[in-house]
Amino acid sequence: MNLALRAKISYILSHGLFWCTYCISWSYTACFLTSKGYNSFTVGLVTGLGAITSVILQPVTASLAGKIPFLNDKRNAIILKIISLVTAVLIMAGFPGSLSIAVLFTVLTAIDASIPSILSTLATSYINSGRYLNYGAARGCGSLTYSVFSLALGIMVSHAGTDILMILYIFFGVLCILAIAAFPANISETGNNSVSDNPVNPSGSRERTGFLARYPYLYSFFAASILLYIGHNIYNIFLINIVNRAGGDSVNLGTALAISACVELPVMAYFVRLENKIPVEKLMIISSIIFTLKAFSAIFATSVPAVYVVSFMQIGAFAIFTPGSVYFICKHLKPSDNSLGQALLGSCTLGLGGTLGNILGGFIIDRTGITAALVVAAILSAFGAILIAASMKTCMQPHKTT
C-alpha cells in the first residue's frame, strides 16, 4: 500500500472509529448515568466538568508536544485514547450510584472532547509537510458514522441495556488506536513538534500571550467560534425539545439528525475543491451567516417539515465551518504554532461552546421554554457572525498575515 493511500484510509478510519466512541461518551452520557442511579443534576455536572476540563487539557497536550521530544500529535492521541480505555474498564468495574463512576465519566468525556483537535493537528501537520490529505472527507465520514452509530446504539441499548455501552466503547477504542497508529509518520513525528521559529521562554514553554500577540485576529475569531457554537449546541442538544414543540417524536428526531449528517458529508468531502474556488476567509464569513440564518429559522420551525429544513441548513453552517476553521488555522499560523492553534480552537468550540450551550440552553428552557432559548441562540450567532467578519478582514491585511 502506497503512503498516500495508507494515510487516507487510516485517517478516515481514525475519525470514523473515534466518533463512535465519542457518541458513547457524550450522546449517551445521560442514558448511562441515569441507569446507574444518578440524577439529572449530576449528569449535567459531569458533562459540564468534562467540557471545562477539556478546555484546559487541549492546550496543555499541545504545549507538552512542543517541549518533550518523545511526544507528538500521533502519540498524544494514542496516549489519551489508552487512558480513556482504562477509564472505561474502571467504569465497568464500578458500583452503581457511587461517586467513582461520575468522576471516571468526567475523565472520559474530557478526554474525548480533547482528541478532535489533535486529530485536526495530525492532518494539518501532514499537509504542511508537503503531502496531500483531505481532512474534510475524513471529518465528513466521522459525522456520518456518528449519526448512523447513534441510531444503531439506541436499538442495541434497548435490547441489551446500558452495560453494553462500555463494552462497545472499548471495542471501538482499540480499533481507533490501531487506526491512528497506522497513520504514516510526518515531520512532527520525527521529534519535537515545535523545533522551528516559535519563541520559548528559558524553561521551554510557549508564551500564550505571545502566541495571540502574533495573531491578534485570533481573539475575535475564537470569541466568534464560542458564540457560534453556543448557538449550535443549544439547537443540537435540545433538538428533541424543538421536535416536540413541532408535534414530532423520537422518529422525527432521528430523521432530523440523519438529514444533518447526510448533508455534512459531501460538503466536508469536497471542501478542498471548494476552497480552491472560494478563499477560506470568505467561506468562514458565509458559514457564520448561514449559522445565524439557521438559528433564526429554528425559532419559527413549528412544524416537523420546518425542522427538517433547518436541519438541512447544516449544509452551509457546521459543514463548512468545521473543516474551514481547521484549514484557516493551518493557513494563517506558522507550522510551529499549528498544534496550539488547533488546540485552542477545540477548546473554544467543543469546550467552551459546548459547555455554555448546554448550561445556558438548559437554564433558559427550564424557566421560559425552548423558543426563548432559540432566540438567545440566534442573537449570539449574529454577534458571532459579526466577529468572524471582523477577524477575517483583519487577517487578510498584508501586515497581519504570516
Residue ranges and their predicted role:
Residues 16, 98-116, 226, 306-320:
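Hydrophobic core of transmembrane alpha-helices in multi-pass small-molecule transporters
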Residues 339-367:
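A late C-terminal transmembrane helix in Major Facilitator Superfamily
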Residues 57-71, 157, 267-279, 365-366:
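Helix-to-loop junctions at the C-terminal end of transmembrane segments
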Residues 108-141:
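Cytoplasmic helix-loop-helix junction between adjacent transmembrane helices
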Residues 165-182, 372-391:
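Symmetry-related core transmembrane helices of the 12-TM Major Facilitator Superfamily/SLC fold
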Residues 1-5, 184-222:
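Juxtamembrane intracellular "pre-TM" segments in multi-pass secondary transporters
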Residues 75-90, 282-297:
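Structural signature of the two symmetry-related core transmembrane helices
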Residues 2-51, 217-256:
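Helix-loop boundary and gating motifs at the non-cytosolic
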